[in-house]
From Swiss-Prot:
Originating organism: Schizosaccharomyces pombe (strain 972 / ATCC 24843)
Transmembrane intervals: 147-167, 178-198
Topological category with respect to the lipid bilayer: Multi-pass membrane protein
Record keyword Hydrolase present: no
GO cellular component terms attached to this protein's record: mitochondrial inner membrane; mitochondrion
Record function comment: Has a role in meiosis.
Location(s) in or outside the cell: Mitochondrion inner membrane
Name of protein: Meiotically up-regulated gene 100 protein, mitochondrial
An example Gene Ontology biological process: meiotic cell cycle
Keywords: Meiosis, Membrane, Mitochondrion, Mitochondrion inner membrane, Transit peptide, Transmembrane, Transmembrane helix
Amino acid sequence: MYTTKRFQQLLKEFEVALLLKFSKQLLLLGKIESYLNNGSSMKHEECKSQIYDCRMAVKIYVCSITANKSTNLKHFVRLFFLLGDSERVNLCIKRLIYTFIGSINSVIDKKEDIEQELYSSCMHCSIMSPKLQKVMLAQKSLILNKVFDYLFFLYGLSGTSILYTAGDHIRKLDFKDSGFITPFFQLLLLVLLFTLTFKSKHSLNAYSLTASQFSGHTVCNESSLKPNENSCDLNLSRTATIKLESAEDDACQRVLGLIKSYMRPRTLEELKLEFRFEHKSVQDITTCILDEVDGVQMARVLEINPDAPILAF
């Protein structure tokens, strides 16, 4: 069984390694494009002097996309081991992992064509052919898709705080020589990340939780179900009592979402969750929670990340 601290450390390694790889790939593509686009206007000797640099950039790039496969698989294998045996790993998380690996493999499958085209262009100091331009554009698109797949993968595991960290890394990257990501595009990327973070924290904040709130016995009141008002502290270590003074149409789904997202990977019986309500109208919430959690075995989910400053949904 993994420890939360070890799990967070793994995610941090994963985040830094991959985001830097993606940024380097984009920078290399920009450098290669610069060599090829400038080659036609150079004198022959000037061009020859850059052939080696151009080919080295191609080689590093191809090695980079090849290395991504083994690097990512290594991290994912470690992630599986830390999460526990296969029966205890949430099926949704597994799907995310396999989807992410698939997006990486889609880049690797094209590496032979990329290498051949780029090497040929380097040697002849020629500008990129229409075919090569399409290949380069496709590569950039795939890399950016990987970045977003990766961010949302981590977002699903660690909550909104991962977007702050990823945003910090992106903000520190230097894309001025990439020939592709302009400062304006970089700004748009950051705006998107923080917009997603803001939305997840404010438009869906039926509950706002911090790690320090996961202790002692807690009772949630009516205000906890109303967005943009007081947060609700829940203790999910062994027993949780939820006291609702009134019900809303989506109250069941929000309570269920909390349990599915932040419960330790134990069965519902082991947790001995207890639900108490003030009004008869909310008795349906109890049925919804028990049926859905137990029916699809969603009681086995990830432990809350104690290092996140705030988690909301």
